[in-house]
């Protein structure tokens, strides 16, 4: 780390932040601050600071009231009632007309919102009075309220061009979005300024923290950098078990990976505990499913696949590869940490007779290849999963791209039937059991090899108080964070 520090010192400016601003360092600029278009993780995290949603989520990923409460009148009709204190940043009340305009905009095919598909079950949305909204569904959906995480815009803004909005319904208002990607926000309750600063290089972000040019850096720091920062005076590291799910995806349309025994051999060849300990510095938890154990539909009896190289070799032999080494290509991003992970996987698979060829690609090419099915194996993560509809999106046979996210072309009639049954079940306890069955089926079939959930981390300067992190890595704590004097520190 010392060499990295010396090499990067010239990149750190001497500029000090304004005393009235709290500065958050992020690795990439948001693509949009418009809730109709905020589909990448950074855009979504910042957009929700500016645009409040009808529905929020508790720690078990259950829907709870946000801007509104609701009732289900029948299987395809939900009525939402807005809170009386909901206001835009100009002081106007948030009304049913604003909600209707926001949802109709996203549902309009001409807008080309990336969020439209997630709301495809809405047949109609109508204002009953100034605070009441009715949603009519195409099909019954007992989990429908959980799909309404879209930030609400003022009606005039919702009808306007992308990112041209003026009024915020969330805890912050927008001061400026600069050409370099930096964002200036003002907290509505007390006027505190928050500067969101793009610093692409992780080492430079760390150095800016030390220099006092940043106050908070959340996530996207290598484990060794976090360990080093934890030893620095004037800084502290906070952590929270995360829900970012990492996995290996397979192309099941042709080749040796169509054989479940080969996929199972790969799963048993991976020493998850060793990778979590040595590479992640214990800042991850081994996974058995997409959804963490804290999720309300997580199957309680799932077990992380065992590290068992003897069994892996036996499975490969049974699949016809006992006398020859199987060669497979693994696509990943060119990020240095992901390449180190790929090398560890390569070494572990080599021990059971699998030769893993690493194909590192820039992010755009890599993600494009995965979406187009141009891979044998790839490594990716799901960020912030809350809804069990991920099972349809990722594993139903009708969800192959471009209709969905079944990128590996997994096709099992039993899984399809379980997904459809779970979606149509209206009784919560029976629905939960159906999702448990889906998770067990996927752990057996292994269209994905589950790896781990990465821990959420943040590094704070000592004078920053009131900042906590949650499981999905949101920036929501900016609504309560504040700077304290030396006498107030604890």
Predicted feature residues:
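Ligand-site clamp/hinge motif
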Residues: 181, 186-227, 346, 355-357
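Surface-exposed binding/hinge segments that line
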Residues: 73, 81, 114-157
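Append "and occasionally in soluble cytosolic enzymes with long acidic Gly/Pro-rich linkers
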Residues: 257-347, 411, 418, 437, ...
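Extracytoplasmic/peripheral linker and loop segments enriched in polar/acidic and small residues
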Residues: 15, 355-366, 393-462, 490
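N-terminal lobe/hinge region of extracytoplasmic solute-binding protein
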Residues: 26-75, 81, 104, 167-169
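Aromatic- and charge-enriched surface segment that lines or borders ligand/interaction sites
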Residues: 69-112, 128, 134, 205-208, ...
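Long beta-strand-rich cores associated with HINT superfamily self-processing modules
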Residues: 458-490
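Gly/Pro-rich hinge or "lid" segments in bacterial periplasmic/extracellular proteins
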Residues: 60, 139-195, 201-204, 309-310, ...
């Amino acid at each position: 780390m010392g060499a990295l520090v010396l090499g990067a010192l010239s990149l750190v400016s001497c500029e000090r932040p304004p005393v009235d601003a709290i500065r958050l360092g992020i690795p990439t600029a948001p693509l949009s601050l418009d809730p109709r278009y905020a589909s990448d993780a950074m855009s979504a995290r910042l957009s929700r600071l500016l645009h409040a949603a009808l529905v929020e989520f508790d720690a078990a990923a259950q829907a709870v009231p946000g801007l509104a409460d609701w009732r289900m009148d029948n299987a395809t009709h939900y009525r939402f009632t807005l809170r009386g204190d909901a206001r835009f940043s100009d002081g106007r009340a948030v009304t049913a007309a604003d909600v209707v305009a926001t949802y109709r905009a996203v549902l309009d095919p001409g807008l080309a919102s990336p969020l439209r598909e997630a709301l495809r079950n809405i047949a109609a949305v109508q204002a009953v009075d100034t605070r009441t909204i009715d949603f009519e569904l195409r099909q019954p959906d007992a989990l429908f309220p959980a799909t309404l995480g879209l930030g609400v815009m003022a009606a005039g803004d919702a009808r306007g061009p992308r990112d041209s909005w003026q009024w915020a319904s969330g805890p912050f208002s927008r001061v400026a979005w600069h050409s370099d990607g930096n964002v200036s926000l003002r907290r509505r309750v007390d006027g505190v300024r928050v500067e969101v600063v793009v610093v692409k290089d992780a080492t430079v972000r760390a150095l800016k923290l030390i220099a006092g040019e940043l106050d908070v850096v959340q996530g996207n720091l290598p484990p060794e950098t976090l360990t080093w920062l934890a030893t620095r005076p004037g800084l502290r590291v906070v952590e929270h078990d995360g829900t970012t799910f990492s996995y290996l995806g397979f192309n099941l349309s042709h080749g040796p990976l169509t054989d479940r025994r080969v996929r199972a051999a790969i799963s048993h060849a991976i020493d998850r505990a060793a990778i979590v300990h040595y590479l992640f510095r214990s800042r991850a938890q081994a996974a058995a499913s997409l959804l963490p154990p804290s999720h309300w539909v997580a199957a309680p009896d799932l077990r992380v696949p065992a590290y068992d190289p003897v069994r892996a070799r036996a499975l490969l032999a049974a699949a016809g590869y006992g006398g020859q080494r199987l060669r497979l290509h693994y696509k990943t991003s060119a990020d240095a940490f992901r390449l180190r992970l790929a090398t560890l996987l390569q070494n572990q698979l080599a021990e059971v007779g699998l030769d893993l060829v690493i194909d590192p690609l820039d992010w755009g090419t890599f993600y494009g290849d995965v979406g187009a099915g141009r891979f044998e194996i790839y490594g990716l993560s799901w960020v912030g999963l809350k809804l069990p509809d991920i099972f349809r999106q990722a594993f139903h046979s009708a969800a192959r791209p471009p209709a969905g996210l079944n990128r590996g072309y997994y096709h099992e009639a039993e899984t399809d039937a379980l997904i459809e049954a779970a979606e149509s079940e209206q009784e919560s306890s029976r629905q939960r059991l159906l999702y448990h069955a889906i998770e067990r089926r996927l752990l057996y079939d292994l269209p994905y090899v589950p790896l781990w959930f990465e821990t959420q981390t943040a590094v704070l300067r000592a004078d920053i108080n009131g900042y906590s992190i949650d499981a999905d890595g949101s920036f929501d704590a900016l609504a309560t964070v504040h700077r304290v004097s030396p006498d107030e520190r604890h």
